[in-house]
From Swiss-Prot:
Compartment(s) of residence: Cell membrane
Positions on the Cytoplasmic side per record topology: 1-10, 86-101, 170-202
Stated name of the protein: CASP-like protein 2U7
Family according to the record: Belongs to the Casparian strip membrane proteins (CASP) family.
Subunit structure: Homodimer and heterodimers.
Topology in the lipid bilayer: Multi-pass membrane protein
Predominant subcellular localization, coarse grouping: membrane
Length: 202
């Protein structure tokens, strides 16, 4: 009983961590913005023209994907937390339910963890390009240093959320295959009992 309680608590804490970390990454990305000024050399003009620009997540498709993915992971984690709490209060023997629920959790957790990992990888690549630049992409962090610094926090939260989501997916897969083995063992026991019952008949 104590072991079951510890497993439930660990899974709940991991889901809670994934939810808050992905939500933090989402909010930081969406709310982060900075106004910057940079000069443009125009042919024929004696002096460069000073131009104002605003950096936010809507300027790059990768940032939109990152924000959307973090929102999906946070929403999914909240849904699973609600289901888990309902399962605990109802006195269900397992936080992941029966075979069908275990399959749904397994597929959902694997999808969420891979989506979170993909979003974290995209954010890391964008952070690198913003800092170092590329042949066709200037180092925008030169002009928007505060924006890049704050976005770095979102990248850290995204990777921590990925770690929590992967641990949740590992627990879900372990439970699913363990449940599958238990069900197979129960079926074999029923068959043996049926065979013994048939043999005992005169």
């Amino acid at each position: 009983m104590l072991e079951l309680y510890e497993k439930r608590r660990a899974l709940l804490l991991l889901r809670l961590a994934a939810m808050f970390l992905s939500l933090a990454a989402l909010l930081i990305t969406v709310l982060n913005r900075e106004d910057g000024f940079f000069s443009i050399n125009v042919f024929g003009s004696p002096q460069p023209i000073l131009t104002k620009a605003t950096a936010d997540f809507t300027l790059v498709k990768g940032l939109k994907f990152f924000a959307g993915a973090m929102g999906i992971v946070a929403g999914y984690s909240f849904l699973q937390l609600a289901i888990a709490m309902a399962s605990m209060f109802s006195g269900a023997p397992s936080i992941l339910g029966g075979k069908r629920m275990a399959w749904l959790c397994f597929v959902g957790d694997m999808t969420a963890s891979h989506l979170c990992a993909a979003a974290a990888a995209v954010s890391a690549q964008l952070a690198y390009l913003g800092k170092r630049g590329a042949p066709m992409w200037s180092a925008v962090c030169t002009y928007f240093s505060h924006y890049c610094l704050v976005f770095g926090l979102a990248v850290i939260f995204a990777f921590l959320a990925t770690l929590a989501a992967l641990l949740v997916a590992s627990i879900s897969s372990y439970h699913l295959f363990r449940l599958h083995g238990i069900l197979q063992q129960q079926q074999q026991q029923r068959r043996q009992l049926q065979q013994e019952h048939v043999q005992d008949k005169p």
